[in-house]
């Protein structure tokens, strides 16, 4: 049974982006969400909102900053006063979408790529229960390896959030960075799982590894599960256009945003100590989603 949408203060929702035509991509960063979103965006009648971080805005505040205060009467996002703020949250997303993507108002599809806002996915799916959800997951060891490369000195993300004159976090203390990123992975995936399990609408869970191994059939499965009609020839063209093999060589490789696209590449990238750190922290999720790798890990 699908949940009822919270009351919205915005009149004429039907003239904006239809809530049921929003497709969220949640999970964690460095999981292939840009690739997946780009394949969907390339289809006629689609647009992609690239990481609005609305999930981070509300989720980080609600789950971590407020803590137990949300159970009382004074926190603005109080648990017992959800009816007062879920509607405005809904308005924020729909209003922001309509202002930015008028080309899909009235009938098009909007893919919202929000891996780094996945901490707030339970709240967003509660605010927009008509919307569709993709739970995208990738082996945590590959996620950590990719993240370490992205934030290493001289790499594509290294200078965005810190002084470029300082050595990046993965370079200064790679083991500490691996630990931090593994813990972040657990938080993001657990919240995404919570949202996925609670969502009564259309949804699908996808492993990056399956998307990489058989892209076209996995995309077909996604559209079937989400109950979105898709033109076969257009889907095939989009998959081909965005395939790893068709990315120019100068745009991929170590230190680039598109790095390996190689499941299991962590075996070449992480030290044994880093592997042990990541596996210890993420063991329950590895056992659940990647049981076929048990022989490489031993008993966890």
Segments from the language model and where they lie:
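PAPS-dependent sulfotransferase catalytic core
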Residues: 1-96
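PAPS-dependent sulfotransferases, especially Golgi type II membrane carbohydrate sulfotransferases
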Residues: 1-23, 148-151, 157, 174-181, ...
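Short, well-ordered beta-strand elements within core beta-sheets of diverse protein domains
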Residues: 24-26, 206-211, 266-268
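Residue-level signal for short amphipathic helical patches enriched in basic/charged
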Residues: 31, 43, 128, 214, ...
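Generic structural marker for isolated residues within well-ordered, non-membrane alpha-helices
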Residues: 37, 94, 98, 121, ...
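A short, structured active-site edge motif that brings together acidic residues
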Residues: 51-55, 137-140, 235, 239
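PAPS-dependent sulfotransferase catalytic domain
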Residues: 62-63, 108-233, 244-255
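Alpha-helix-centered segments that form part of catalytic cores
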Residues: 85-110, 178-188
């Amino acid at each position: 049974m699908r949940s009822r949408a919270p009351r919205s203060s915005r009149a004429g929702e039907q003239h904006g982006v239809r809530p049921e035509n929003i497709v969220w991509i949640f999970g964690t960063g460095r999981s292939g969400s840009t690739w997946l979103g780009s394949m969907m965006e390339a289809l006629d009648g689609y647009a992609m909102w690239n990481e609005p971080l609305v999930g981070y805005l509300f989720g980080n505040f609600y789950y971590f900053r407020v803590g137990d205060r949300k159970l009382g009467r004074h926190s603005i996002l109080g648990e017992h006063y959800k009816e007062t703020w879920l509607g405005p949250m809904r308005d924020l997303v729909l209003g922001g979408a309509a202002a930015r993507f008028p080309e899909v108002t009235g009938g098009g599809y909007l893919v919202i790529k929000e891996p780094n806002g996945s901490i707030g996915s339970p709240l967003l799916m509660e605010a927009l229960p008509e919307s569709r959800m993709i739970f995208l997951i990738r082996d945590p060891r590959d996620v950590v390896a990719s993240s370490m490369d992205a934030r290493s000195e001289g790499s594509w993300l290294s200078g965005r959030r810190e002084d470029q004159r300082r050595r990046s976090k993965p370079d200064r203390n790679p083991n500490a960075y691996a630990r931090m990123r593994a813990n972040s992975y657990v938080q993001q995936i657990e919240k995404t799982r919570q949202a996925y399990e609670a969502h009564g609408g259309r949804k699908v869970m996808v492993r990056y590894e399956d998307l990489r191994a058989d892209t076209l059939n996995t995309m077909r499965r996604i559209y079937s599960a989400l109950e979105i009609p898709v033109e076969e020839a257009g889907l095939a063209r989009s998959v081909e256009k965005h395939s790893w093999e068709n990315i120019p060589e100068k745009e991929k490789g170590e230190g680039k945003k598109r790095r390996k696209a190689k499941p299991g590449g962590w075996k070449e990238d992480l030290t044994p100590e880093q592997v042990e750190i990541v596996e210890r922290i993420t063991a329950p999720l590895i056992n659940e989603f990647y049981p076929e790798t048990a022989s490489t890990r031993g008993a966890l």
